[in-house]
Amino acid sequence: MNCRNTHFLSIVVIFVMVLCLTLVLSTKVRSGSSISSTTISGLVCDPNGPIANATVRVQTTNNSTITDANGHFVILNLKPEEPVILTAWAEGYYIGGGQTQYLPGTSDVEIVLTAHSDEDNQSYAWLSAFTSAGYVGSGEDNNCEKCHAEPNNPQVALPFSEWQGDAHALSAQNMRLLTMYKGTDLSGNQSPLTRYVQTRDYGRIPLRPDPNKPYFGPGYKLDFPHSAGNCAACHTPAAAIDRAYGTDPTTVTGVGTEGVTCDFCHKVWDVRLDLKTGLPYPNMPGVLSFEFRRPPEGHQFFAGPFDDVAPGEDTYSPIQTQSQYCAPCHFGIFWNTVVYNSFGEWLDSPYSDPQTGKTCQDCHMPPDQNNYFARLDKGGLIRNPQTIFSHRMPGAMDEELLQNAVSMNVDANHQGEQIIVTVSITNDQTGHHVPTDSPLRHLILIIKAEDEQGRFLRQSGGTVIPEWGGIGDPNQGYYAGLPGKIFAKVLEELWTEVSPSGAYWNPTRVLSDNRLAAFTTDTSTYTFASVADNEVTVDIKLIFRRAFITLIDQKNWDTPDIVMEHKRINVSMR
């Protein structure tokens, strides 16, 4: 169907007369650029008429233009005799075009757009990302792996393969989540239910765990055995999309077990934020802060960062490249305490400046060397690699990312019989606090000084690592009492006064927070008494730890520390 088939004849005649007059006038304004061997012109419309402000693009390039008030466009700077494929997109429509080649000089191009539904279909059945799910649909009703992975070329990591190893893909099966939810260790041993006592002033309040009974760490279900909570709102969003507070993440099935899965992310149309703060509303975690466009029966809908993916039922959504996309699951308030706030930390930093800053995607979805994101034999197109976002999304388990998060400068010298070590750590490469998100995460700075015989020098000044850094053998990761410090957001449970606490589903308060905000520096000084005659070696190490070591032991998690910075300095005593 072309742009005019649906008009009555009289309306068509009037429309064509007005359009022709407009085109004549606009041709005079553009003076000579309307028809040439280096331009293509035409009209973008839907069955009701022209569409203004539509983006027309030479597919896979940055050569684009915007339609005028009458839907007219002119694409410039084309190579003579070199055919191109054009696409068009406008808000509220699927991307159109993408099928016909046009030679420069063509002046009668017509691209018809189809409007997509402006409602969310709650009856939509999610598509699995995996071919192993067994469903093989037709067209775009297919699994993601089929077109977005290269099974016969492991050197090429397309989006499915990158996502498969990412924490988002593993969020529903994250054993730290599941054991913290159930109150178990990795072997399934469960801690006793929380004990309570009735008080005159405060009513029923919780008690600390019974020290005479086996304890395998905290658990949401130990404190709230009859509630599902809202963990699923972020960790199993496909399952929780319509039941954010009623989905138990340990019982989800099907696509829900795929975590933050492909189909879920590409059904996101917008994010609901508080206009005053720029943050999600406190009572709207995860899926509650997203606006979705699940398509009606017989249709599909994929929103993405390109406005030229055609043909197909795809559309462009600017939110896909904005940090606000990440806000619903990277900001969390429990009992009026801000527990995690990566998005807000970014928002408060210079990185949020739209002119000079960086988005979450700039750092966590940087382009790699791939020049296509869908298999070429499945309709994929060659593109500039710098326009394709990686789906590897490195985060707290990525060693390379962590080792490029902060800078550490050390000055070590002797004054008389004292070794003075000054350590400065600067968050100069990260757009939020370090560490961020889960309050279980922390950095441990460890300073050791030893003489030529390998004997450790006695610390005579400076802070030491607190008890919750681990009481025991330093060679096994128990660093309490050693020279150094910990960078962390420490929560304390209000009723039991347990701290540091990872059970932030309970009422807590922020006991302390000395994490490194963007572009801030922490400087600390340590002194050691020395009787060495020749040389002292100072070892300075900054490590990232996923959780408090006591909790790691209780849950039996396998979460090795990651060394972020490490320096050894020899100090001459002469």
Residue ranges and their predicted role:
Residues 32, 101-129, 133-134:
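Extracellular beta-sheet/turn segments enriched in Thr/Pro/Gly and aliphatic residues
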Residues 35-54, 79:
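Structural motif
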